[in-house]
Amino acid sequence: MKFLIAIKNTKEESKNILEIGCKIAEGFSADLTICYIGKQSKALIEGDVNLARKTLSEWNIHHPGLEVLEWAFNILKEKGFAPDSDFDVENLVEEKGRIRMVLPKTTNYQIGLVLREGDLLSELNKEVKHGDFDIVIMGSPHRKRMTNKISQFLDTSIFFVKNFNPNWNYKILLCVDDSRATKRAVILSTRISKQFDAEITSLTVSKTSLFGKGYRNAHIWAERYLKRIGIPFNSKLLSGNPVEVFVNEAGEDHIIIMGKAKGNEFLKFIWGSK
C-alpha cells in the first residue's frame, strides 16, 4: 500500500499529523510520502537552478518549502521512522513540477519527501495521481469550502485529522453501512486499532427504526471480522440522523473511520464534531 501525508507548515498540528500518519502507515508496512505544497517560487518556474550545485542555505532563500521538508525529516528521525542521518540537499532530485528525496530504506517500507509549489488542490491532485496512493492523511481545512473541494476532487480515500492529541488514549468509531467501501474501512480500523491499542465501536445508523438487509448484513459482517481478528470491540445499531448520531457517539476521544460517505454527510460530520 502507499500512503500520502500532506503537511502545511511546521506547527504542532502538522507534527501531530505526521505522528498519527506514520503510525498508521507502519501498521500497514505501507510506503509513505510526506508532501508539502508551498507558494510558487520564481526559481522553480524558470527551472534555472541546479540542485547539485546549491547549498541548503542558498536553497532556503528561494525555496522556504525545503525548510518544511527538513523539519519533517527531523520529526521522522525523532519518532524513529527515519534513519539517523543528515538532511542532505544533494539527495534531492528535481522532476517536472516536483522535488523529491527518497530516504535510505531501513525498514520494510519506503519513505520519501516531496515539495510541490502552486495551488494546493491542483498540486495535491497531481501528487495523488503521480503516486497512485491508497489514502491521503491531512489536517482538516479551516474552510468548509476547501474541505468540500478536497473530498470531491481527490480520487482516493482521505483521512482528515482534526484536533489530534498524541497524549490522549483514543478509541475508534467505525461507521458501518452498505457502501462498497465499508469492508475496506473495517479492515483499516483493525490495523489502526493495533497501532494505537484502541478499542473499536462498530456503529450502524439508520434514519428510521427499520434496518434494511444491506445494513444488517454489513453490521454482522463487521462483527464477525472483528471477532476473527481478535480486536476488542462493541457494536451498536442506532436510529436517527446519521450525522447527529456520529457526532454524539464520537465525542472528543475517537478516531473516526468510515467508507466513502454519500453526498455531504461526511463533511457535516467533520464540522459538527469536536
Give, region by region, the residue ranges found by the protein language model.
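Small/aliphatic-rich secondary-structure junction motif
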Residues: 1-62, 171-236
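Gly/Ser-rich helix-loop-strand patches that form or flank binding pockets
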Residues: 13, 18-20, 25, 113-166, ...
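Low-complexity, serine/threonine/proline-enriched polar segments
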Residues: 61-88
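Short mixed-charge
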Residues: 78-107
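Short boundary motifs at domain starts and secondary-structure transition points
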Residues: 101-105, 161-168
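Generic structural signal for residues in well-ordered beta-strands
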Residues: 106-113, 158, 233-235
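Conserved active-site histidine-acidic residue motif and adjacent donor-binding/catalytic loop
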Residues: 116-121, 238-244
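A short, acidic, amphipathic alpha-helical segment used as a generic capping/interface helix at domain edges
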Residues: 222, 239-250
